[in-house]
């Protein structure tokens, strides 16, 4: 599509169907950086990243979406992607045990489930739980849309490599709400979209991708939105967490290592706190408490 990760929205003039097209090559590479995930887990995270970007683009408000696989008895105990309406993404996975290169979703997760959490900047949080009945993340999320919004939705996700670097992209088709539905038209557009090749998604401009798929259709392509990796960790957040720990626990950690090393699983950053830092934090927290009371 382009040298930078972007999400494009598009609309069919003669059908009550809208679409999205996204490429997340660079963001995907940053999610995988500093981690030694098995190839099957890398692929799964790429699929989840694409899906989260496409889902986030459906938000009509400022807020966050988290797509999380909670493992059951499989070796993949957790896989999660966080995104927001600004298309800022991050993700991480946890693995305990061996995962072969050709492991399926069910083999990795076991009797787990998919959790979609939508958190508006203002308003109540919504959470949907989907059983892993589909063979892919895309199939599971299509079930989610039918359960939660009753809107026929199809996702087409591709992962792979370009010049030996991880690449991922995808497309979403969805029937417009409050419109008269024509299942045959939607199925026809879905069949066309399913022919998209991975290398086309990874490398071609959006307008060329849409022309190759829908050259007999009238399609409006809207201005793109940039997609990026962004971690929300900070030294202050770590400090806020430390002051909630019991003094004995903090003292024990300091005695063992001489400092407390707080490591962010998402981006790999380390935040070190020594005894002087801890004392300053505790004193500051105590002073704040005195002011409150």
Swiss-Prot record:
Signal sequence extent: none
Localisation: Cytoplasm
Highest taxon of the lineage: Bacteria
Coiled coil: none
GO annotation, cellular component aspect: cytoplasm
Disulfide cysteine pairs (residue numbers): 231-233, 264-267
PTM comment: Under oxidizing conditions two disulfide bonds are formed involving the reactive cysteines. Under reducing conditions zinc is bound to the reactive cysteines and the protein is inactive.
Chief site of localization: cytoplasm
A Pfam family per the record: HSP33
Keyword terms of this UniProt record: Chaperone, Cytoplasm, Disulfide bond, Redox-active center, Zinc
An individual GO BP term: protein refolding
One Gene Ontology MF term: protein folding chaperone
Keyword Metal-binding included in the entry's annotation: no
InterPro entries listed in its UniProt record: Heat_shock_Hsp33 (IPR000397), Heat_shock_Hsp33_C (IPR016154), Heat_shock_Hsp33_N (IPR016153), Hsp33_helix_hairpin_bin_dom_sf (IPR023212)
Matches recorded under NCBIfam families: PRK00114.1
Task performed by this protein: Redox regulated molecular chaperone. Protects both thermally unfolding and oxidatively damaged proteins from irreversible aggregation. Plays an important role in the bacterial defense system toward oxidative stress.
Family the entry assigns: Belongs to the HSP33 family.
The protein's name: 33 kDa chaperonin
UniProt source species: Yersinia pestis
């Amino acid at each position: 599509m382009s040298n930078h990760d972007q999400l494009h929205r598009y609309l069919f003039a003669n059908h009550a169907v809208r679409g999205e097209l996204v490429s997340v090559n660079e963001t995907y590479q940053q999610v995988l950086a500093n981690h030694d995930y098995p190839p099957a887990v890398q692929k799964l995270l790429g699929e989840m990243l694409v899906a989260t970007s496409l889902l986030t683009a459906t938000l009509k408000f400022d807020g966050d979406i988290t797509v999380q696989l909670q493992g059951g008895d499989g070796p993949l105990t957790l896989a999660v992607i966080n995104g927001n309406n600004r298309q800022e993404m991050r993700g991480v996975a946890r693995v305990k045990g061996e995962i072969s290169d050709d492991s399926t979703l069910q083999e990795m997760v076991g009797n787990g489930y998919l959790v979609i959490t939508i958190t508006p900047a203002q308003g109540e949080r919504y959470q949907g739980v989907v059983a892993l009945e589909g063979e892919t993340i895309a199939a599971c999320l299509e079930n989610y849309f039918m359960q939660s919004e009753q809107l026929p939705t199809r996702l087409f996700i591709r992962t792979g490599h370009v010049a030996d670097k991880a690449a991922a992209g995808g497309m979403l088709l969805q029937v417009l709400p409050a419109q008269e539905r024509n299942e045959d038209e939607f199925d026809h557009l879905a069949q066309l979209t399913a022919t998209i090749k991975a290398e086309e998604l990874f490398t071609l401009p959006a307008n060329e991708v849409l022309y190759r798929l829908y050259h007999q259709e009238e399609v409006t392509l809207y201005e793109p939105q940039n997609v990026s990796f962004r971690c929300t960790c900070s030294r202050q957040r770590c400090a806020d967490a430390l002051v909630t720990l019991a003094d004995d626990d903090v003292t024990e950690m300091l005695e063992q290592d001489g400092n407390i090393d707080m490591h962010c699983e998402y981006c790999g950053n380390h935040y070190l706190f020594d005894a002087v830092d801890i004392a300053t934090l505790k004193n500051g927290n105590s002073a704040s408490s005195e002011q409150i009371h």
